[in-house]
């Protein structure tokens, strides 16, 4: 007989552009088949899931189920830590995908449909995965740090997420692809110094710097198709500067992962990545798990087996 785990469910009703709120009765019914007793809290503001998760774990919770997209899961994962220490190293994260972006679940083989996700919650064990920690400069210019689960990237990706957020505030169409296209049309590659472990990359202009723990980002783009959540290494994918016409010709490769063979793309594996703008360069935006939070300079550190998650590798 399986042990009954003290369970907390954290729901972001605004995820999936509000569809989670509409689907909640269906999701709740599915959860009842998985577990009879659990506490539930709905988030009402950004970063609230961090506080809920942290408080719940301090109260002895053993399983936190996140209902939302990658941003919601990122917040919950940050709540598993108090500074640099896990609050309860034996507690696990369960996932019910319900967001505009559910890229992490692809690396964990969690179906996006409700029945499949519930089956994983019921049948999958709690597996240890690596996580990332990034120290960066906040939008207010202060030193900050945050954990991430899937992918953190700087350059074009940070600009795209800012455009997505801007359009949402203006209640305009904010699909990732539309925002990517509009951003590429005006984006200029940046001069960045990059160091991976003990190796300094040649100084160059970079369009994308993706520090990948998982395989997929940007609503399904296979940025690091060979990445693994438990190999103890980041897959750092560095895309050098391209003219607009060149990117339009080659950018489709990101969808199926074939970009790694292109001459302006480098893949380097390592446990620590440091990225610093060249002097005089304009601010370079950083995003992690689909949330734009600050700028370079930044240091990305891999935390081996930093979190237990219900899923399959």
Report each predicted region and the residues it spans.
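Nucleotide donor/acceptor-binding cores
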Residues: 5, 91, 271
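ATP/NTP phosphate-donor binding region
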Residues: 1-67, 78, 115
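Short amphipathic alpha-helical segments
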Residues: 21-23, 76-80, 106-108, 222-223
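Short glycine/serine/threonine-rich phosphate/pyrophosphate-binding segments
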Residues: 49, 71-76, 103, 129
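Glycine-rich phosphate/pyrophosphate-binding beta-alpha loops
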Residues: 153, 157, 210-224, 292
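ATP/nucleoside-binding phosphotransfer catalytic cores, i.e., glycine-rich phosphate-binding loops
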Residues: 196-203, 223, 228-229, 238-313
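Catalytic core of DAGKc-family lipid kinases
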Residues: 34, 43, 82-207
